[in-house]
A protein has these predicted regions:
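Long, charged/polar, soluble alpha-helical segments
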Residues: 2-6, 18-121
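Sec-dependent N-terminal signal peptides
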Residues: 5-13
Length: 121
């Protein structure tokens, strides 16, 4: 009887954790989250090209990083999203070092990476 209670408790825990998956908590569907992230990366690129200061561009990149966290579809998309996020982090690092040309190149790479995520859905 005691082992039956333990087994039932374990099954209830497994069932409840399966119901509460991370896509259920996502604020946007994956396609919309990708579009939002691409738009934010593009706004960071536009700001950098227009001569905005590094802090303002860094804040825009941070917004794009935050938006990218909403992209949640599959393991393949997660890996590709992580690569794009790492590219954005590199762009912020280059901005802090004062290398706007390298930051712009990283932002272009991030834009391509996030744009290609829709093909993985």
């Amino acid at each position: 009887m005691k082992s039956l209670k333990t087994l039932l408790t374990a099954l209830i825990i497994v069932a409840s954790s399966a119901v509460l998956s991370t896509p259920a908590f996502a604020q946007y569907p994956p396609e919309q989250a990708i579009d939002l992230t691409v738009a934010k990366v593009q706004s960071a690129i536009d700001a950098l090209k227009s001569g905005a200061n590094a802090d303002a561009v860094s804040d825009l990149i941070k917004d794009a990083l935050d938006a990218s966290k909403e992209i949640n579809a599959s393991d393949t998309v997660f890996v590709a999203r992580t690569k794009g996020s790492n590219t954005l982090k590199n762009a912020r690092k280059h901005l802090k070092e004062g290398s706007t040309k390298d930051a712009e190149q990283e932002l272009d790479n991030a834009l391509k990476a996030f744009s290609n995520l829709k093909k993985l859905l």
